[in-house]
Amino acid sequence: MRVPTIAYSTDLGSMYHGRIEEALKQNKVKALRGKVDLIFTSPPFPLVTKKRYGNETGEAYLKWLEGLAVILTDMLSPTGSIVLELGNAWEKNSPTMSTLPLEALLAFKRAANLHLCQHVICHNPARLPSPAAWVTINKLRLKDTYTHVWWMSKVERPKANSGNVLVPYSKDMLALLKRQSYNAGKRPSGHDVSATGFLTDRGGAISGNVLDFTSDADRVPSSLLKFAGTGWDTAYRNYCKAQDVETHPARMQIDLAAFFIKFLTTEGNLVMDPFAGSNTTGSAAEELGRKWLSIEAEERYVIGSKGRFGNFFTPQSGNPVGEKKEANHE
């Protein structure tokens, strides 16, 4: 098994090329134990068949993820959070869903004695229909349009500030703020709504736990608008094409990474992604002024991920991950 190496760095972070189990044994990484404010990652999904981005399958996936729980949690600061994005899974050759992602989550939580702070849904109606056999061919199931995001921590009240990810007010709320009145008093539910509790403009509304960052969504946090559009992914894809390497087939939405980085950390904090893929997490952290540490086992994805960083790089010796070199025409 290869020794993990630093593939590239910026002033704020480094990308390691290697498996997470080995990377955590490196002295520079071990020195960060107890100092990571947020681990945000999307482990390879527990698909029924092996994909080219290195996923485990079946029971092996559960044991693998469970085995990482303690060593990853040890990296967290006392008030740090670990956030896992887990997709849905289906039984092999069957239009029935697998409970493996939930079983793996529970095994991970129990192994590290974590608190489950909240369950968040990331909705993306633009996702391709899947599983294709049961959705588009046999038409027996509905299109899968969301992933689960599980926020956990070592303590019940980890560092968090929902004020950092406020969403725009609805038209009704804007009208209420303008007229400065509403129907206060008792509700059938038993709640007693005060006469002034909703009259203060706080700059936006508290985000719900169903996130939708698609182009037609009208309630994207204003602090994340700079991540909207396709520009972030276009630069990455163009770089991969120039380097003649394949793009990652299951890239994370940069808006999702940025949301949790803004929500759970402050500028200068340390963000870690142990399954970095195209290093969406690292690039979002860089843009938001957070320090970052990313780890990826597949060399081709490490090479391509450099395309997310533009001119942020600091000098590295040699050609550590086989990056395509420009021809010398002298």
Where are the language model's segments positioned?
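Core catalytic lobe of class I
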Residues: 1-304, 311-312, 329
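Conserved phosphoryl-transfer catalytic core
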Residues: 310-328
